[in-house]
């Protein structure tokens, strides 16, 4: 399994001959190296409905005939836009031809915000994502605060690689993310959701230096880890 980081919370996984994108916020993302028009993808996994995570999902899904796996309300909302979706919910798992997906808790919000019409559409509960393929498991925490059931995620799953938000303000900050890493007990931890906007500026290298009992790695956009 090859796992690549593409800025903010964008993660690409190549496994079982398929390409999977998590939270493909590409257009308007100053930290990504990807252009939506160049992306080939078989499946898109979404943690929640905010614009900096849904991003280019509709365009990518239609262009590539990709399935979008998302929490039920968000999947329904996207299906109304002509997207092929597979709805799930927290605690549920499903085996796809590209791998196994399980949604975990995340403490955040989830909505589609239409600035032009000043409307907010509820898109269900936010989620974290456990993805398993080729006997390896990746945990993408989505946007979340620290919560004690992260201990349970670590107890019930053998996590090989975890992506944790460290930006603070909208998610947990570096200090809480250090504790999250301890509880999740992943072999390797990569920081995400930082330095995209001024309000979430952080030093990822200081974060990885504070990690204990795991390997911390800062990935620049386009860099990857092979599991």
Swiss-Prot record:
Keywords associated with the record: Hydrolase
One Pfam family, short name: Lactamase_B_2
Database matches in Gene3D superfamilies: Ribonuclease Z/Hydroxyacylglutathione hydrolase-like (3.60.15.10)
SUPFAM superfamilies in the record: Metallo-hydrolase/oxidoreductase
GO molecular function: hydrolase activity
Family: Belongs to the UPF0173 family.
Protein name: UPF0173 metal-dependent hydrolase BCG9842_B0515
Source organism (scientific name): Bacillus cereus (strain G9842)
């Amino acid at each position: 399994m090859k796992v690549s980081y593409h800025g903010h919370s964008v993660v690409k996984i190549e496994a079982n001959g398929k390409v999977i994108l998590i939270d493909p916020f590409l257009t308007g993302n100053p930290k990504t190296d990807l252009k939506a028009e160049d992306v080939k993808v078989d499946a898109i996994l979404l943690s929640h409905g905010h614009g900096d995570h849904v991003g280019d999902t509709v365009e990518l899904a239609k262009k590539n005939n990709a399935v979008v796996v998302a929490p039920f309300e968000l999947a329904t909302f996207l299906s109304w836009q002509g997207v092929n979706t597979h709805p799930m919910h927290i605690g549920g798992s499903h085996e796809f031809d590209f791998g196994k997906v399980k949604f975990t808790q995340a403490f955040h919000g989830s909505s589609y915000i239409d600035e032009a019409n000043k409307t907010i559409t509820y898109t269900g509960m936010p989620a974290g994502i456990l993805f398993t393929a080729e006997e390896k498991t990746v945990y993408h925490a989505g946007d979340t605060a620290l919560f004690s059931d992260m201990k349970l995620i670590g107890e019930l799953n053998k996590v090989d690689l975890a992506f944790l938000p460290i930006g603070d303000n909208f998610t947990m900050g570096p200090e809480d993310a250090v504790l999250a890493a301890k509880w999740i007990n992943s072999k390797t931890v990569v920081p995400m959701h930082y330095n995209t906007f001024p309000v979430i500026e952080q030093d990822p290298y200081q974060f990885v230096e504070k990690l204990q009992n795991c390997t911390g790695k800062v990935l620049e956009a386009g860099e990857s880890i092979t599991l």
